[in-house]
């Protein structure tokens, strides 16, 4: 019956969770069409691979699709969803399509509020180094592939599992990684208890012969572990973790020692900075050891790791100012990114441009956002990236700036749009600065435009 489906339409095809699935489907020989609100490099890439993509959503985009896949951000009143249901065409979430792809392979899924993309990418790098030729689907651009997906011929499918709407429960992996369990996506979940319940169900969804590799350092993970009835391998810096890391040296590269059940395994070098990325590496090491990949192969892969797009990505330097871009948009991610910035560039003044992501997240975590920028010398705020959400009265980039000023000494400036922020940059940035653009929306454009502008302008 699977052969009856040949034409697949994807609404929001350019999104981080959708584009990788689309690329794998194209490589498998399916006819893929889709729509997205705007043109992007990702949309252009998918078009070059054979996808037929419309810019904007409309009833006419659907064509004669056999199934419609929608991203988390797409609502039930989307015209393409409406016409599909009128015609009796199945409309499924992206996780259900990912689950179908996973049925064809041995699945490994990486979940967690933060660190999913990097951990998934590290696993992909290790499995590729080991000659396993995995299929990989991530929510970012793995620099080694130049894309967020890769169709391999091997046994394993390694994928990022999206907890944002609970649809990661569609997946049936043989092994999982959970990096952390934190308060986020409160537009979908009623509270932290509901988030805990979803992660417990996810961990208990693996078979009895599988394994869950989980970060014991995270309080949320530690909180739910007593409710998990499947095999567990804990990792972290804690002396209670079975797979334990100890940082030896940190900087542009991270050097750390690894031990398992008290036995020293050796030293690793990760071609990526940050304490949080050592934790991500430990999660990937845990799964790799469970599969049977030799320690030497793991070490070689970590040393070669080329990184992930928009994860503390050095974009360039102009007039003595180093520009780094990062996807971080949750307070915990922001703190980790700024700590990394301080560790890698300790002598530089830290100027941060932040675009909040979603009105619901900004409202729910307002207090945490007010205190997470304390490591910055200067903070430039712009308006909230809505991600299809309607505005919430009293919640804005400007109100966030007011809140930050009340509780920290960080210098804060608010700009209603990118144009205003970019116009102010020449008077703010000076030689020796580190300029970090932060956010899940389009704030990266500010750094890109600064680097592209005339030198010294």
UniProtKB/Swiss-Prot annotation:
- Which E.C. number(s) belong to this protein? 6.3.2.8
Protein task: Cell wall formation.
Question: What biological process terms from GO does the record include?
Answer: cell division; cell wall organization; peptidoglycan biosynthetic process; regulation of cell shape
Q: Which GO terms describe its cellular component?
A: cytoplasm
Location comes to: Cytoplasm
Name of the molecule in the record:
UDP-N-acetylmuramate--L-alanine ligase
The biological pathway it contributes to is: Cell wall biogenesis; peptidoglycan biosynthesis
- The residues listed in the UniProt record as binding ATP, with positions renumbered to this chain, are 112-118
Supply the gene name. murC
Give an example GO molecular function: ATP binding
Q: Which family does it belong to?
A: Belongs to the MurCDEF family.
Q: Which organism is it from?
A: Solidesulfovibrio magneticus (strain ATCC 700980 / DSM 13731 / RS-1)
* Keywords noted in UniProt: ATP-binding, Cell cycle, Cell division, Cell shape, Cell wall biogenesis/degradation, Cytoplasm, Ligase, Nucleotide-binding, Peptidoglycan synthesis
Recorded catalytic reaction(s): these are: UDP-N-acetyl-alpha-D-muramate + L-alanine + ATP = UDP-N-acetyl-alpha-D-muramoyl-L-alanine + ADP + phosphate + H(+)
- The domain of life is Bacteria
Q: Which InterPro entries match?
A: Mur-like_cat_sf, Mur_ligase_C, Mur_ligase_C_dom_sf, Mur_ligase_cen, Mur_ligase_N, MurCDEF_pg_biosynth, UDP-N-AcMur_Ala_ligase_MurC
